[in-house]
Amino acid sequence: MGRGRYPARLYVTAPPPEIAARYYRSWPAKELYHTPEHFPPVSAEGLFGYNAPLTLEFGCATGEYLCALAAAQPSSCFVGIDIVAKPLYRAVERAVAGNLSNILFIHADARLIYQRIPTAALHSIILHFPPPLLRNRQRNQLLVSPQLLECAARTLVPGGYLSFLTDHPALFALMQELLPAFPALRATPASVEELAVFESHYHRRWAARGRTISGLRIERVMED
């Protein structure tokens, strides 16, 4: 995991079957890569059984931010994805404590999820404080990538947006460098207050250390 993310310190256990059936899915990378058609589409209809605005968070960790959104917006649906299971167990605990019916967590490699999202299925995408993974051998694991932006351009509804926050200047610069290749996306600098309706653990953590937090609202351009 990236800096500041320490799932090994979380003393949590896997949710019992009846809770997992409601809130948790595990999509193994090998199966998702070779037989993606065996997994449901990542859409409100595909995962919740009804149509509603859907927000997807990549790297949701313990689900603190996404659960707060789900509680505040009961008529929308929310899906959190993380490549590490233990933080998601804590996320499920939060969802249970809030008796939330509009949220689901998926243990999976986000990069393999892109292909399972139908066109124009998402109202918004959240990518807040992703690990920079700047060592050379980790470059192919970056969530800030052409593949992410290609996914956003295809899967966001017109007027939908990707909310991006980072405390890492190189990651912010990389996002700005990649965006011109995607004319269907329009990026606008945005303050933390504009993008984050709630301060997550990592938001508080990096702000407390005095790090500068930069944000972009990356909107899917309305079609003519």
From Swiss-Prot:
Annotated pathway: tRNA modification; N(7)-methylguanine-tRNA biosynthesis
GO biological process assignments: RNA (guanine-N7)-methylation; tRNA methylation
Residues noted as binding S-adenosyl-L-methionine in the record, renumbered to the chain: E57, D82, D109
Binding site for substrate: D167
Keyword terms of this UniProt record: Methyltransferase, S-adenosyl-L-methionine, Transferase, tRNA processing
Any GO MF annotation of the entry: tRNA (guanine(46)-N7)-methyltransferase activity
Gene3D superfamilies: Vaccinia Virus protein VP39 (3.40.50.150)
Any Pfam family the entry gives: Methyltransf_4
Reaction catalysis annotation: guanosine(46) in tRNA + S-adenosyl-L-methionine = N(7)-methylguanosine(46) in tRNA + S-adenosyl-L-homocysteine
GO cellular component annotations of the record: tRNA methyltransferase complex
EC nos: 2.1.1.33
Signal peptide: none
Function description: Catalyzes the formation of N(7)-methylguanine at position 46 (m7G46) in tRNA.
Family note: Belongs to the class I-like SAM-binding methyltransferase superfamily. TrmB family.
Name of the protein in its database record: tRNA (guanine-N(7)-)-methyltransferase
Lineage: Bacteria, Bacillati, Chloroflexota, Chloroflexia, Chloroflexales
Gene, per the UniProt record: trmB
